[in-house]
Regions:
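Short, acidic loop-to-helix structural element flanking the phosphoryl-transfer center
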Residues: 1-19, 25-29
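Well-ordered alpha-helical segments embedded in enzymatic catalytic cores
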Residues: 4, 61-65, 134
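Structural recognition of alpha->loop->beta junctions
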Residues: 37-48, 116-140
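Substrate-recognition "cap/lid" segment bordering the active-site pocket of phosphatases
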Residues: 18, 22-81, 87-98, 104
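Alpha-helix N-cap/helix-start and coil->helix boundary motif
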Residues: 6, 24-26, 38, 87, ...
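CheY-like receiver
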Residues: 8-11, 65-68, 138-142
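Acidic, Mg2+-coordinating phosphoryl-transfer loop and its flanking beta/alpha structural elements
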Residues: 82-128
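Short, flexible, glycine/charge-rich loop motifs used to bind or transfer phosphoryl groups or to couple energy/partner
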Residues: 7-8, 34, 71, 116-119
Length: 143
């Protein structure tokens, strides 16, 4: 976990959390549990939960994560935030929004604090968090 992320997750504990990652579900849950925040994540979708043809940036895993948290009926009426450190994550967020359709909105946040360079990406995020603390302000705009 990036330094300060525990604070961000805890401050917004009242919001439903999920993870969709190219890591394995077991590894993700192990890290979350080691920081004492595993119970805050209602859904964790790892690469091992998604078939090879449906890996990111295909929206399948993201939609599965959202539906696990909110149910199928509510999934297309939500405002969601997806935070990622690769350009493919921003494309993934756009693909989830398109797959959910209707009134769903997925806000893409690039984790610039991970030494990525989102200002050079072709697929632009809605926000760039250059420091973990920036997430407090970005998420706060929508709560």
């Amino acid at each position: 976990l990036f330094d300060g992320m525990n604070t961000v997750v805890s401050q917004f504990a009242h919001l439903p959390h999920g993870i969709c990652s190219q890591n394995s579900q077991l590894n993700i849950r192990g890290v979350l549990d080691s920081y004492g925040i595993g119970d805050l994540f209602k859904s964790v979708v790892g690469y091992d939960d998604v078939s090879n043809g449906h890996q990111k940036p295909h929206p399948f895993g993201g939609v599965k994560c959202v539906e696990n948290i909110f149910g199928v009926d509510q999934a297309n009426e939500l405002c969601l935030m997806y935070i990622g450190d690769h350009e493919a994550d921003t494309q993934f967020a756009r693909n989830i929004e398109a797959a959910l359709g209707k009134n769903a909105k997925v806000i893409a946040v690039a984790a610039g604090y991970s030494r990525s360079e989102p200002e050079n990406w072709q697929t632009k995020p809605d926000y760039i968090a250059n420091h973990v603390d920036d997430l407090l302000t970005i998420i706060g705009k929508y709560t």
